[in-house]
């Protein structure tokens, strides 16, 4: 397993434990290690959404979407688009329930 994958797994584990700030730190390291890999941006965006930091989440989604042009990143692009919509919808509202999903809602490319 690559260092990138180990760091991603650590971040995902922290996320699942509800340690979103710590997960953000792990995902920052992913972005630093591979700035053109959209996975770090996508994962960080979801952790930021959980923290209620919607503006930063929007920025992460927008940055990540710059790097989703390859076929292998189609699923990540869909996640980024979904998370961008979640964060944009939350900006200005009091609070909306946000849940992580293993399956994307209808209308999002699942490839």
Curated annotation (Swiss-Prot):
Signal sequence interval, chain numbering: none
TPR repeat ranges per the UniProt record: 4-37, 39-71
Modified residues (N-acetylserine): 2
Keyword Lipid metabolism among UniProt keywords: no
Compartment(s) where it occurs, according to its Swiss-Prot or TrEMBL record: Cytoplasm; Nucleus
UniProt superkingdom: Eukaryota
SUPFAM superfamilies recorded: TPR-like
GO MF term list: protein-folding chaperone binding
Gene3D superfamilies from the UniProt entry: Tetratricopeptide repeat domain
Principal localisation: cytoplasm
An example Gene Ontology CC term for this record: R2TP complex
GO aspect biological process, one term: protein stabilization
InterPro entries xrefs: RPAP3 (IPR051966), TPR-like_helical_dom_sf (IPR011990), TPR_rpt (IPR019734)
Entry annotated with the keyword Acetylation: yes
Coiled-coil features, chain-numbered ranges: none
Keyword tags: Acetylation, Cytoplasm, Nucleus, Repeat, TPR repeat
Matches recorded under Pfam families: TPR_19
Additional remarks: Present with 1660 molecules/cell in log phase SD medium.
Subunit (UniProt): Component of the R2TP complex composed at least of RVB1, RVB2, TAH1 and PIH1. Also interacts with HSP90.
Protein's UniProt name: TPR repeat-containing protein associated with Hsp90
UniProt organism field: Saccharomyces cerevisiae (strain ATCC 204508 / S288c) (Baker's yeast)
């Amino acid at each position: 397993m690559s260092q990138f994958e180990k760091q991603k797994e650590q971040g995902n584990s922290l996320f699942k434990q509800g340690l979103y700030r710590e997960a953000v730190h792990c995902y920052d390291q992913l972005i630093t290690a591979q700035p053109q890999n959209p996975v770090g941006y996508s994962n960080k965006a979801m952790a930021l959404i959980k923290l209620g930091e919607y503006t930063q989440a929007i920025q992460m989604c927008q940055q990540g979407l710059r790097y989703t042009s390859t076929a292998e990143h189609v699923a990540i692009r869909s996640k980024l688009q979904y998370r961008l919509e979640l964060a944009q919808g939350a900006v200005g509202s009091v609070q909306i329930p946000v849940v992580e999903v293993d399956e994307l809602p209808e209308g999002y490319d699942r490839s």
